[in-house]
A protein has these predicted regions:
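A short alpha->loop->secondary-structure connector
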Residues: 117-126, 147-150, 173-180
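Short amphipathic alpha-helical segments
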Residues: 97, 221-225, 293-295
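Conserved beta-strand segments of the P-loop GTPase G domain that flank and frequently precede/overlap
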Residues: 38-40, 130-133, 157-160, 227-228, ...
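Short, surface-exposed secondary-structure junctions/capping segments
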Residues: 285-296
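Nucleotide-state-sensitive switch-loop elements of NTP-binding domains
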Residues: 2-12, 17-140
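C-terminal accessory "lid"/substrate-recognition subdomains
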Residues: 152-287, 301-341
Length: 341
């Protein structure tokens, strides 16, 4: 986290996936004393807020109700965040360090993150925490919202561990990685350790994971592919291709992350998006000094044939995660990526 910057967590997960319980577990920890919470519910009665407030009313909390934060009450969200940041803290409490937004179970993270652009002056460090209900597994993948939530997440926490089988917990990392190989997976028995990791400091994202050759997408509409530059790329061509990719896929683009070496820079550029919202590209020093170029793309209802013609055409060749090569795995071990800001 940048000096003085507030950490902003978007807590995302499908209906009934355990978001409120996960948040409540965290708020019961001493480390949560410097936290403010925003709860968004689609409806006039904020039940989750009542549940979270049960047991104490010292927590700074704001309710956004009667509308989904990702599509209906964006201006209210920005106003609420700004109000929490500038508000005077109660005497004896630590400075505000962290804001957690618990979205409704139907909210997609991409539009939510886009609404934070007006708050750039606060220089917040932002990450999406997703929930994975062990008792339901990938059953909710039939819902577009659930797939979008998992794909956008930087961290995915397994929930309802006490209700799930031992096999469900042990298989969770592989199952989640097949949906979003870019996410840090949190599948722990201890609830305190789970929340400490889920809402832990945003100093740097973990390296891109080492995906083994037997990883397969768990949902037939989900596409996990890798784009490699065919030759040296200029920055204008890269920017145009990314812009056209976002335009061509629209909401079908769920997540993108990787490194691209451009002609005029010594270090590769870190490229990252949640949905069609791209973070500013930034040079990234590789741990071993190597220069690598590839983009991981997570999308749904997309055929590889759609990607090739995107202009400027011929910049990338595409391969599936089902057959990752050793060089790609080595590259992903040494990346020191940064969180979306």
């Amino acid at each position: 986290m940048s000096d003085g910057g507030i950490e902003f967590f978007v807590l995302s997960g499908f209906l009934g996936s355990g978001k409120t319980t996960l948040l409540r577990d965290f708020l019961e920890q001493p480390e949560a004393a410097d936290t403010a919470v925003i709860v968004n519910e689609v409806g006039e009665i904020g039940l989750d807020g009542i549940v979270l407030r049960d047991g104490g009313d010292s927590l700074p909390m704001a309710m956004l109700s009667n509308g989904c934060v990702c599509c209906q009450i964006g201006s209210d969200l920005a106003f609420t965040i700004d109000r929490l940041i500038v508000a005077k803290r109660p005497h004896g409490t630590p400075p505000l360090r962290r804001i957690i937004l618990e979205t409704s179970g139907l909210a997609k993270p991409g539009p939510v993150l886009r609404q934070l652009a007006s708050l750039a002056e606060h220089r917040m460090k932002v990450a999406v925490v997703g929930t994975f209900d062990l008792t339901r597994g990938t059953e909710t993948a039939t819902f577009e919202e659930a797939v979008s939530q998992w794909a956008a997440a930087h961290r995915i926490a397994a929930t309802k561990v006490d209700l799930a089988s031992v096999n469900a917990l042990s298989e969770a990392p592989a199952t989640i990685a097949a949906i979003n190989p870019l996410a840090e997976v949190i599948a722990l028995k201890d609830r305190a350790s789970t929340v400490a990791t889920a809402f832990g400091p945003l100093v740097a994202a973990p390296p891109l994971p080492d995906v083994s050759a037997d990883v397969k997408a768990t949902h037939p509409r989900l596409v996990l592919c890798c784009a490699r530059p065919v030759a040296d790329i200029s920055y204008p061509d890269l920017a145009a291709w990314l812009d056209n990719l976002a335009g061509a896929l629209g909401d079908r683009l769920l997540r993108l992350k990787g490194l691209v070496q451009v002609k005029t820079l010594k270090q590769p550029l870190l490229i990252e998006s949640v949905g069609t919202l791209f973070s500013p590209p930034r040079p990234l020093q590789m741990a071993d000094g190597s220069q690598s170029s590839f983009l991981v793309i997570i999308a749904h209802d997309v055929m590889e044939a759609e990607l090739g013609p995107i202009a400027p055409s011929g910049l990338f060749q595409f391969s599936s995660w089902q057959r990752p090569d050793a060089a790609l795995r080595d590259e992903r071990r040494v990346i020191k990526a940064e969180w979306v800001t």
